[in-house]
A protein has these predicted regions:
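Short amphipathic alpha-helical segments, especially helix-boundary/capping motifs
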Residues: 30-33, 82-86
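Flexible glycine/serine/alanine-rich "lid" or loop that lines and gates the nucleotide-sugar donor pocket
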Residues: 89
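C-terminal helicase lobe and adjacent C-terminal extensions/tails of nucleic-acid helicase motors
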Residues: 1-15, 20-59, 65-67, 71, ...
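Conserved two-lobed SF2 helicase motor
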Residues: 69-85
Length: 360
């Protein structure tokens, strides 16, 4: 479809619901469409790496100048995740997206033909968005970890063939999020709806525990800064819940490439050489803080944290004396960008970000 639709040029945006899918699809398209520009864009880059990719995406698919908007862009495909829908001012001639809850889906569609004065290929002058509906929902459970089954079901049910934006937005969003009439539901629908209600109730309970209290002097004295974060948490269980996010926790760590004899390089700055037996300068610390990345939640949290803590403590004790670096975790890759961690093979590249595969 891409070869046909973008045969005369243009930019396609493909948005999927997981980073792993985005990476796999980008790999596939690079092989299937030689000579095309395929750019993966997702959250699993280092802070600096993501900023570089974002800059490239905006330069190629952003608003640009009035002169650039009169030129047809040539066979560019951006394969991304939710990061595309959130804030980027990008403009796609064609969009392909996996199903997501209606409000988020409409945000994605808002990146289609976003700039009205842009010249587009003849066959892409009308905005078209292809929404991919999961085939075997019981087999593919990856989306359930991201979005509610009920919201996905409701969105698929109420998704029309054509949409007028922004006129249709309130009606469509309300159709998905309104209270359901359970008397008309099948058992499977009721199960999805009740699970959704329980999830929402759980979020509300966590939010109540973590509500900021007024900045009373006694609270500051008793609990310090943490006291401001956890207002009425009286038990250790409540304190734990107050720090739990709505998604599974992931580990943030600094990525380095290991050289020889205790020398290391930041993955995004190969010109900087760091020695583990030397104190870090302020500039070096600032660089390292830009090399932070969140590990996939599929990696066992406790096992990975324990392994990284041990590695960091043993290999970088002098660095940890720096107050800014204290409690930071460091993941060391080999010169090819590979590492093993908690039963997973990891590989980092500036093009695809951090990829993971479970060791069988």
């Amino acid at each position: 479809m891409l070869e046909e639709q973008l045969g005369d040029g243009g930019v396609a945006g493909i948005i999927v619901n997981t980073v792993k899918k985005a990476q796999e699809l980008a790999h596939y398209l690079q092989k299937a469409l030689p000579g095309w520009q395929i750019i993966p864009f997702h959250s699993r880059f280092t802070s600096l790496g993501r900023a570089k990719v974002e800059k490239e995406v905006l330069s190629l698919a952003g608003k640009g100048t009035a002169e650039s908007r009169q030129k047809i862009r040539d066979r560019l495909v951006i394969v991304g995740t939710q990061v595309i829908e959130q804030s980027l001012d990008v403009d796609f001639d064609l969009m392909i997206t996996e199903l997501s809850p209606m409000d988020l889906l409409l945000q994605r569609i808002g990146r289609l033909h976003r700039h009205k004065d842009r010249v587009r290929p003849k066959n892409l002058e009308e905005p078209v968005c292809h929404v991919l509906i999961p085939g075997d929902k019981k087999t593919d459970r990856s989306v359930s970890a991201v979005y509610s089954d009920w919201l996905q079901y409701q969105t698929e049910k109420h998704l029309p063939q054509s949409i007028d934006i922004p006129e249709d937005i309130p009606r469509l969003v309300n159709a998905v999020y309104k209270d359901a009439d359970e008397s008309d539901q099948l058992q499977e629908e009721q199960d999805k709806y009740h699970n959704y209600l329980n999830e929402e109730k759980g979020k509300e309970d966590k939010a109540e525990i973590a509500i900021l209290a007024p900045p009373y002097k006694k609270l500051r004295m008793d609990h310090g800064i943490n006291g401001l974060k956890i207002s009425n948490a009286k038990t250790s269980e409540e304190r734990g819940l107050a720090t739990v996010r709505d998604i599974k926790p992931s580990i943030s760590c600094i990525l380095l490439k290991g050289e020889k004899a205790g020398a290391f390089r930041p993955v995004d700055d190969e010109h900087m050489l760091l020695k583990s037996d030397q104190k870090l300068s302020f500039r070096e610390v600032q660089t390292l803080l830009k090399e932070v990345i969140s590990l996939p939640i599929s990696i066992p949290y406790e096992a990975a944290e324990t392994e990284l803590e041990q590695t960091t403590k043993n290999r970088f004790p002098l660095w940890m004396d720096n107050p800014i670096m204290k409690d930071r975790l460091i993941l060391v890759l080999n010169e090819k960008g590979d590492a093993e961690l908690a039963g997973f093979n990891l590989h980092y590249s500036t093009e695809f970000g951090l990829e993971s595969r479970k060791i069988r």
